[in-house]
């Protein structure tokens, strides 16, 4: 019999405590719990890993080697599994050739559509290019009324310079009498002299015909002769009216522009047949950017305003610049912005043909001198970039280059032949520029001829179906040409979700990791109905999620806890959402039922008159936005997905501040100016990127507390006696580390066809250090024992050392008391990595002049984690600093001092500021979707707080 549930027995992956779980099949199951409690360990590292592994085991050993190794999870048994598909956030392609269209395969169908029913047009003349038979030409000409006079002409020269004596001589020999030269009739018996430096067009008059009955045979003979002479082209001059051009080849009759047979690869920018030859199908070209070459125009040339020519070791370029300035009389002590344009142009673009005297003396006193042509700083960088064989130089030069739209294909990525094929007046590049919603409307209303409709019917059905799936999961604002690398984790995941809905599989186990990330409350219902739709096809969905709406919509809810890390790993409660809400042990249940909640702040901070202000922001979809962010407050930037939040904050504000305050090289998005810089001295972006890419990086090394701990060990009597310095206690350098495993503690053994096996090092038994180093102890513990301690244990262990205690306290405050100091960075979740970064900021001394930017800090956080995160963020603001978050989570938004709401819609329908002010002010704005969803939350929490106060008063009385 088919099992109606998945039984997991004895799961021990990571921090799971040998748990048994029962999951109903063909249901929407949500797994929730604190960050680090073991949700992903259960869903991904146990259930998915085993489902995938069993499926892959059925393939041949040859096929398995290409699929990557699947570890067997640490579990006793799992029954009732189906093949598993995981839709997570990690696997987005960063390849610049990947676009929303290619990832969803919509672009493949578009290519097919254009190859089958597209109409080629001449890019010069706009004429549709068709090939016609003589019968079709005759029929077209005989449409004219009777007695119409016309001439049949054979074009033999079109728009070419020369006297064309030989051509005319040849025609005369063939027995022709008349020609038309540049529109004027001439007899070949006359002396014809043409100016050889002018362009000429020559047509031979083959026949003169009057349209009447019985003329068809003569007309087709004349056309045949004309086509032979005109190499496949013929011109019909209807006297006193118009001229017709016919071609028997697939070519423009005027200029001969032709396209071979249309095939799908012609429209692929990843194939040499279709890609634009200038940018190789990327749509962008790296070009030297004058703004990056001279980032600060307030400096003079003497103060090294030309960034790439700042002297490092050699004085060659500074001396060359001096020679150029001497030659042209350019003042090197004046700020660059005050130099006349023609002088600055000489420095940037070179001296042309002028020769400049240049005398160069190197560090060894050797002298070279002579007259040289100066190529200009920009050309110099471009040349060095193209000619160098060294990756280092190429990277150096790339810092001064930026991506510009390709001049040949205007950013459409395809060669001109592909862009000359139109459907309904648009080429394929124009279609990919449309948002999903607009493209859907375009294809639904598309009218084609009956024959074309028959051919395109199936293709159109696929395109419309896929577009509507994207629309269903709330991605209607994305354009098909959007690069996949610029999508947020949630967007990428919802795209894959749409692709899966499109495949309409049944009986599959889908495992999703927080699909609601980056999704506004408004679009949440669409996502939930998409998930239910997949469930109704007969699939089991296991969703790791913290979103309240998704949890309430689940058929079955599993709460893992009670704490995080070593304090978690158990099933606290499982059942319908209502059953979990009733369970007194479940933290999630308490939040869902309202017994626990994040309170509103007693009062909101008032802006103190210090602002950072962006004027005229117009990158991506922003419509010349002017935004003000009050400093010294906790500010949230909100708006539906795709409204322009990340563009405004990350692309413009962060990059512009980093460029001005930290001399960063990244170029900010387009805007007029930014005011209020004098109130800040640093900007810090705290994102969820891993804190290190290797297992050697860990929370202790990242926060800098490991340095202090090594100092403590180096100060012990034993270390002093042995002469050990702090370097002895590092596992990254020779000396104190175990050399057998080079301080890793584990040794990797590569196995083909089987997962790589990691075994503890036999010499140090996983302790990373050699025996001598481990003999040095502090309070009875070796350096290796300290790395194995949790933050919580280390806090009490080092409580007498204020320097260490302060750093560990901040890790504990952000809710990371459960991680060990030596936990490899690669095993931390995104939320944990972000909190490690927050902690390392918290223990620094505050100046009150720092701006912290956090993009969706609630990703991966449970409501209880969010409560802790808020305490930390409010602490930063209490220190006088400014915190700016991009957020959809209403618990964060309701506690902000100030909100800037973008919208009203996503994509082209967004990019303006809908409202700004306190949360209460936002709820009063009709057009604001954020306000609409925030209002009931604020009212609900006010009621909750009142009843809490009442309960307290009753208790005290």
From Swiss-Prot:
| Domain ABC transporter: residue ranges | 309-587, 607-935
Tell me which PROSITE patterns the record gives: ABC_TRANSPORTER_1, ABC_TRANSPORTER_2
**Which Gene3D superfamilies is this protein grouped with?**
ABC transporter ATPase domain-like, ABC transporter ATPase like domain, ATP-grasp fold, A domain, P-loop containing nucleotide triphosphate hydrolases
Assigned GO CC terms: cytoplasm; excinuclease repair complex
What keywords tag this UniProt record? ATP-binding, Cytoplasm, DNA damage, DNA excision, DNA repair, DNA-binding, Excision nuclease, Metal-binding, Nucleotide-binding, Repeat, SOS response, Zinc, Zinc-finger
Gene Ontology molecular functions: ATP binding; ATP hydrolysis activity; DNA binding; excinuclease ABC activity; zinc ion binding
Primary location recorded for the protein, binned into one broad class: cytoplasm
Cell location: Cytoplasm
Q: Which GO terms describe its biological process?
A: nucleotide-excision repair; SOS response
Q: Which stretches of the protein fold into C4-type zinc fingers, per the record?
A: 252-279, 738-764
Residues where ATP binds: 33-40, 639-646
* One Pfam family of this chain: UvrA_DNA-bind
What does the function comment of this entry state? The UvrABC repair system catalyzes the recognition and processing of DNA lesions. UvrA is an ATPase and a DNA-binding protein. A damage recognition complex composed of 2 UvrA and 2 UvrB subunits scans DNA for abnormalities. When the presence of a lesion has been verified by UvrB, the UvrA molecules dissociate.
Q: Which family does it belong to?
A: Belongs to the ABC transporter superfamily. UvrA family.
Q: Oligomeric state and partners?
A: Forms a heterotetramer with UvrB during the search for lesions.
Write down what this protein is called. UvrABC system protein A
- Species name: Bacillus subtilis (strain 168)
């Amino acid at each position: 019999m088919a099992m109606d549930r998945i039984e997991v027995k004895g799961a021990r992956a990571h921090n799971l405590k040998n748990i048994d779980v029962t999951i109903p099949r063909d249901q929407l199951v949500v797994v929730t719990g604190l960050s680090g409690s073991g949700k992903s360990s259960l869903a991904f590292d146990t259930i998915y890993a085993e489902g995938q592994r069993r499926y892959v085991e059925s393939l041949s050993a040859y096929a398995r080697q290409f699929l990557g190794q699947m570890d067997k999870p640490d579990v006793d048994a799992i029954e009732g599994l189906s093949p598993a598909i995981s839709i997570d956030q990690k696997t987005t392609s960063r390849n610049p050739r990947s676009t929303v269209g290619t990832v969803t395969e919509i672009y493949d169908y578009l290519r097919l559509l254009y190859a089958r029913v597209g109409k080629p047009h001449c890019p010069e003349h706009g004429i549709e290019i068709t090939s016609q038979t003589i019968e079709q030409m005759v029929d077209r000409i005989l449409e004219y009324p009777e007695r119409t006079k016309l001439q049949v002409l054979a074009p033999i020269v079109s728009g070419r310079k020369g006297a064309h004596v030989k051509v005319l001589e040849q025609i005369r020999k063939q027995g022709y009498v008349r020609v038309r030269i540049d529109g004027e009739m001439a007899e070949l018996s006359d002396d014809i002299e043409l100016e050889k430096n002018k362009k000429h067009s020559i047509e031979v008059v083959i026949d003169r015909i009057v349209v009447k009955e019985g003329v068809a045979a003569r007309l087709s003979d004349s056309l045949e002769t004309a086509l032979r002479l005109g190499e496949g082209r013929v011109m019909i001059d209807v006297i006193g009216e118009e001229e017709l051009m016919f071609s028997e080849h697939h070519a423009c009759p005027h200029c001969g522009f032709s396209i071979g047979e249309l095939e799908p690869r012609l429209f692929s920018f990843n194939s040499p047949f279709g890609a634009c030859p200038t940018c190789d199908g990327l749509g962008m070209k790296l070009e030297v950017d004058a703004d990056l070459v001279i980032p600060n125009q307030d400096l003079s040339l003497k103060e090294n305003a030309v960034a790439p020519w700042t002297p490092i070791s050699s004085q060659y370029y500074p001396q060359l610049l001096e020679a150029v300035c001497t030659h042209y009389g350019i003042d090197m002590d004046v700020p660059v912005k005050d130099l006349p344009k023609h002088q600055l142009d000489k420095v940037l673009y070179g001296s042309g043909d002028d020769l400049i005297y240049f005398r160069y003396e190197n560090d060894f006193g050797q002298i070279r001198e002579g007259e040289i042509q100066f190529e200009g700083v920009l050309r110099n960088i471009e040349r060095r970039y193209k000619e160098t064989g060294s990756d280092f130089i190429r990277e150096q030069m790339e810092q001064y280059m930026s991506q510009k739209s390709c001049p040949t294909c205007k950013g459409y990525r395809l060669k001109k032949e592909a862009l000359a094929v139109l459907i309904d007046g648009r080429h394929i590049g124009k279609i990919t520029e449309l948002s999903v919603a607009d493209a859907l409307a375009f294809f639904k209303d598309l009218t084609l001829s009956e024959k074309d409709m028959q051919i395109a019917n199936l293709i159109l059905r696929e395109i419309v179906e896929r577009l509507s799936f994207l629309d269903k999961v709330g991605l209607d604002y994305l354009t098909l040409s959007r690069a996949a690398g610029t999508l947020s984790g949630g967007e990428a995941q919802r795209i894959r979700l749409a692709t899966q809905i499109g495949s309409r599989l049944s009986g599959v186990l889908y495992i999703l990791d927080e699909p609601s990330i980056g999704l506004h409350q408004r679009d949440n219902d669409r996502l939930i109905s998409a998930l239910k739709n997949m469930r109704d096809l007969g699939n089991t969905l296991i969703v790791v999620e913290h979103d309240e709406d998704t949890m309430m919509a689940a058929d079955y809810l599993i709460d893992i806890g009670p704490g995080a890390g070593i304090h978690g790993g158990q099933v606290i409660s499982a059942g319908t959402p209502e059953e979990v809400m009733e369970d007194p042990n479940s933290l999630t249940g308490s939040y869902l039922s309202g017994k626990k909640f994040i309170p509103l702040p007693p009062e909101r901070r008032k802006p103190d008159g210090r602002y950072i202000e962006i004027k005229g922001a117009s990158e991506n979809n922003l419509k010349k936005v002017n935004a003000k962010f009050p400093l010294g407050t906790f500010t949230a930037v909100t708006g539906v997905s795709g409204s322009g939040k990340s563009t405004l904050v990350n692309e413009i504000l962060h990059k512009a501040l980093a460029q001005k305050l930290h001399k960063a090289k990244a170029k900010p998005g387009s805007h007029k100016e930014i005011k209020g810089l004098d109130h800040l001295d640093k900007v810090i972006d705290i994102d969820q990127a891993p804190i290190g890419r290797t297992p050697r990086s860990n929370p202790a090394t990242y926060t800098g507390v490991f340095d202090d701990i090594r100092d403590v060990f180096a100060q012990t009597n034993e270390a002093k006696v042995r002469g050990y310095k702090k370097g002895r206690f590092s596992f990254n350098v020779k000396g104190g580390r175990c050399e057998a495993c080079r301080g890793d503690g584990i040794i990797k053994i590569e196995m083909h066809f089987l997962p790589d096996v990691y075994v503890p090092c036999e010499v140090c038994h996983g302790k990373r250090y050699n025996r001598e180093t481990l003999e040095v102890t502090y309070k009875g513990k070796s350096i290796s024992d300290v790395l194995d301690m949790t933050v919580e244990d280390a806090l009490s262990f080092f409580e007498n050392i204020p320097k260490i205690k302060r750093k560990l306290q901040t890790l504990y405050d952000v809710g990371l008391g459960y991680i060990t100091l030596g936990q490899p960075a690669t095993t931390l979740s995104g939320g944990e990595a972000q909190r490690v970064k927050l902690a390392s900021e918290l223990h620094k001394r505050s100046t009150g002049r720092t701006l912290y930017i956090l993009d969706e800090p609630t990703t991966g956080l449970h409501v209880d984690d969010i409560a802790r995160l808020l305490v930390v963020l409010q602490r930063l603001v209490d220190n006088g600093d400014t915190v700016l978050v991009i957020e959809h989570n209403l618990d964060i938004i309701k506690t902000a001092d100030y909100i800037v709401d973008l919208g009203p819609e996503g994509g082209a329908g967004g990019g303006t500021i809908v409202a700004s002010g306190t949360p209460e002010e936002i709820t009063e704005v009709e057009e604001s979707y954020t306000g609409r969803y925030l209002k009931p939350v604020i009212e609900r929490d006010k009621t909750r707080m009142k009843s809490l106060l009442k309960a307290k008063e009753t208790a005290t009385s």
